[in-house]
């Protein structure tokens, strides 16, 4: 478990060190983040999927649990949160903060750390389903419950259709189905480029981290992150285990519930006229708190011989 989580923590810490010691600028981090999102992460997803036998990598049960748990969680949050949160601008932010995860960066990398790149296809394929669902549900939550500005569903659907991560994952599935193979030199280049994705993504995330963003709203942010990282996995993980999920598929499911709040949730909250400050705090606090919670989760699952 320590070997799985420490590389992630060290890369985040390295990014924080580089930025706060002025070795890199905010502009550099912004440009690197764009490169990573548009090129390196798509290469990683495609490379993880296209050489995999899809039917062996992930089964219908995993998809059913992932989609079913997300929709159930969203429905419950839409009923409960408006009843217990008084501030309208915080309701949509809290809803998306609990269900929405930074799955592509943390989920795929941690499955790779535990099982190796060959077994990371389950997490990569699952991202093709979860990423568009996260975006659509976030738009609904922010539009219906915020009462401020509006997030365009049409624009969001367009962004989903042109999302490099989703396109790469779907192309990987198609390439796997037709059993596409590249010449050795292209496979080597594809592998080398894909290896840049996770380190760069985590370094950029660490560089963007600021303890100052944690000031204010700590009580409500703390409760939200606790529900996300502790309560939700405790509810859904036993269901996945009882359903027979094991190994890479189980870890991929677990990380769909356990990983930090997606960075893009902060931007969407601002666009919707919601509490952008709280959204940013949820991103930062969940990134800090996920290190021990993910470690404990992996340790417990390994101790029970489920991974």
Predicted regions and their residues:
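Alpha-helical transmembrane segments of multi-pass small-molecule/ion transporters
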Residues: 1-307
């Amino acid at each position: 478990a320590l070997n799985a989580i420490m590389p992630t923590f060290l890369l985040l810490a390295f990014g924080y060190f580089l930025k706060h010691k002025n070795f890199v600028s905010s502009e550099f981090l912004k440009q690197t983040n764009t490169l990573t999102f548009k090129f390196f992460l798509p290469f990683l997803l495609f490379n993880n999927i296209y050489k995999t036998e899809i039917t062996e990598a992930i089964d219908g049960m995993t998809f059913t649990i992932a989609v079913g748990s997300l929709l159930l969680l969203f429905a419950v949050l839409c009923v409960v949160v408006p009843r217990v949160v008084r501030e309208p601008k915080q309701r949509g932010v809290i809803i998306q903060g609990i269900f929405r995860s930074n799955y592509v960066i943390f989920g795929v990398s941690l499955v790779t750390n535990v099982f190796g790149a060959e077994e990371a296809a389950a997490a990569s394929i699952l991202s093709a389903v979860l990423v568009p669902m996260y975006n659509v549900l976030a738009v609904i939550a922010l539009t219906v419950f915020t009462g401020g500005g509006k997030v365009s569903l049409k624009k969001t659907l367009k962004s989903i259709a042109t999302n490099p991560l989703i396109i790469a994952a779907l192309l990987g599935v198609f390439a796997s189905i037709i059993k596409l193979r590249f010449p050795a030199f292209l496979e080597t280049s594809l592998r080398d480029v894909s290896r840049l994705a996770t380190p760069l993504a985590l370094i950029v995330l660490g560089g963007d981290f600021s303890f100052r963003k944690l000031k204010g709203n700590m009580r409500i942010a703390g409760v939200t992150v606790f529900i996300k990282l502790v309560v939700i996995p405790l509810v859904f993980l036993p269901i996945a285990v009882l359903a027979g999920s094991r190994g890479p598929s189980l870890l991929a499911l677990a990380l769909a519930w356990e990983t930090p709040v997606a960075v893009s949730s902060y931007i969407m909250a601002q666009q919707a006229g919601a509490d952008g400050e709280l959204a940013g705090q949820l991103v930062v606090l969940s990134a800090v708190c996920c290190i021990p919670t993910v470690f404990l989760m992996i340790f417990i699952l390994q101790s029970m011989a489920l991974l």
